[in-house]
Amino acid sequence: MARGSLRRLLRLLVLGLWLALLRSVAGEQAPGTAPCSRGSSWSADLDKCMDCASCRARPHSDFCLGCAAAPPAPFRLLWPILGGALSLTFVLGLLSGFLVWRRCRRREKFTTPIEETGGEGCPAVALIQ
């Protein structure tokens, strides 16, 4: 009797392997193994790839488990903080520029010295040589 049950088990094993081979040759996809593009996941219920963006509206769909975790919510205060920092930098730059200009303006002499060479007595060619 043990020999008959062993044969039966062997037949079942061969039959199972044969069915698995036929299934793989036929191209039938196992759930979760379909070659979906990035941002989509295989839905066993619908037998096609579904977009992961729809998981926000329906998070309990069967294909949402294959999607990566949802990206974190964007930081909404980024632009106001960045704008404030740039504005502060611009105002401080203008203020420091004005203070430097005012200080240098105070030291500047309003008349420039005039060099008197005596007219035509000293030609430019003589200075170069």
Curated annotation (Swiss-Prot):
Example of a GO biological process term: positive regulation of apoptotic process
Residues making up the signal peptide according to the UniProt record: 1-27
Keyword Transmembrane helix: yes
Complexes and interactors: Associates with TRAF1 and TRAF2, and probably also with TRAF3.
Organism the protein comes from: Homo sapiens (Human)
Membrane topology per record: Single-pass type I membrane protein
Functional note: Receptor for TNFSF12/TWEAK. Weak inducer of apoptosis in some cell types. Promotes angiogenesis and the proliferation of endothelial cells. May modulate cellular adhesion to matrix proteins.
Extracellular side: 28-80
Cytoplasmic side: 102-129
Native organism taxonomy: Eukaryota, Metazoa, Chordata, Craniata, Vertebrata
S-S pairs: 36-49, 52-67, 55-64
Top-rank taxon, per record: Eukaryota
Keywords: Angiogenesis, Apoptosis, Cell adhesion, Developmental protein, Differentiation, Disulfide bond, Membrane, Receptor, Signal, Transmembrane, Transmembrane helix
Gene Ontology cellular component list: cell surface; plasma membrane; ruffle
Protein name from the UniProt record: Tumor necrosis factor receptor superfamily member 12A
Transmembrane stretches, start-end: 81-101
TNFR-Cys repeat coordinates: 36-67
Pfam family, one: stn_TNFRSF12A
Record-linked InterPro entries: TNFR_12
